[in-house]
């Protein structure tokens, strides 16, 4: 089962100030159902109303949950903090935005220093410019993951390290994917592309750039250009021996003839490259 919740605040009054501010938090969780392991073991996870409240207010599972969910939090949780600042000029506007994602408490707090993993972007909107109406540039960084180690204290070593967050993966659930397609940032390569049939995200330590722009050079023609490049380091548990790269591009043109109101025709071409 799936549960999500979000809370956002937007402050904007363009009659008094050209500045707008947005702040928010999103959280989502997978819980319930059966977990299938490669050795044939099937784990049925709790899904009662009591368990739903443990998902809504993230807390430990009871005796019916797995040992991992009793030690940690019931279910597979992810979330993000978001912030954006916009400025409205007389004929155009600009917005800078930032999103920090987390898998557990170590990513929600500043326990391991300032948050390094984030998506940072800048959007410029030029409504009066027909050739380029919107330009977006983004930088993605997911390499830190609260550090490289995940270890619970023992009598021999009395310190815990809750890093190696392993974004989108989970020891019980198949992870944040549906039929092999990732539910998240597209620069984190989906499991459907794994050559060995594994359902895990084999590379979630990524550094990438994305740029997109669109426009309408004539009333009948719209276009869109998207370009993304990324470097992949694998995961902390299974790092790549050498850095792998991925490049993607899209060109799309839409024709909306005045002679046929309500109709549009789209022609698109895309290219993928790299060694992922």
Each language-model region and where it sits:
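Low-complexity, intrinsically disordered Gly/Pro/Thr-rich segments
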Residues: 264-273
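Signature for the C-terminal beta-barrel architecture of outer-membrane proteins
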Residues: 1-152, 156, 209-211, 227-236, ...
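A generic structural motif
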Residues: 247-249, 273
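C-terminal structural cap/anchor segments
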Residues: 146-235
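Short glycine-rich, acidic/polar surface loops and turns
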Residues: 249-256
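Short amphipathic alpha-helix initiation/capping segments at coil-to-helix junctions
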Residues: 202-203, 242-246
């Amino acid at each position: 089962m799936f549960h999500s919740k979000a809370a956002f605040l937007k402050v904007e009054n363009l009659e008094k100030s050209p500045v707008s501010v947005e702040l928010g938090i999103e959280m989502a969780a997978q819980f319930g159902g059966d977990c299938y392991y490669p050795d044939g073991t099937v784990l049925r996870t709790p899904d009662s109303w009591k368990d739903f409240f443990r998902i809504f207010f993230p807390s430990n599972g009871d005796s019916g949950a797995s040992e991992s969910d009793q030690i940690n939090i019931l279910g597979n949780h992810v979330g993000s903090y978001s912030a954006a600042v916009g400025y409205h000029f007389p004929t155009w506007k600009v917005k800078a935005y930032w999103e920090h994602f987390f898998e557990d408490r170590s990513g929600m707090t500043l326990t391991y220093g300032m948050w390094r993993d984030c998506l940072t972007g800048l959007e410029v909107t030029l409504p009066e410019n027909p050739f380029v109406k919107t330009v977006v540039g983004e930088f993605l960084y997911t390499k830190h993951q609260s550090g490289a180690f995940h270890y619970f204290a023992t009598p021999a070593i009395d310190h815990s390290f809750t890093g190696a967050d392993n974004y989108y993966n989970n020891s019980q659930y198949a992870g944040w994917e549906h039929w092999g397609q990732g539910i998240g940032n597209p620069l984190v390569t989906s499991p459907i592309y794994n050559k060995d049939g594994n359902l895990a995200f084999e590379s979630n330590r990524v550094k990438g750039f994305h740029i997109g722009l669109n426009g309408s050079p004539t009333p009948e023609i719209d276009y869109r250009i998207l370009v993304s490049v990324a470097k992949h380091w694998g995961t902390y548990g299974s790092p790549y021996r050498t850095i792998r790269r991925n490049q993607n591009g899209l060109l799309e043109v839409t024709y909306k003839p005045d002679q046929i109101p309500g109709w549009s025709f789209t022609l698109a071409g895309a290219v993928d490259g790299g060694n992922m």
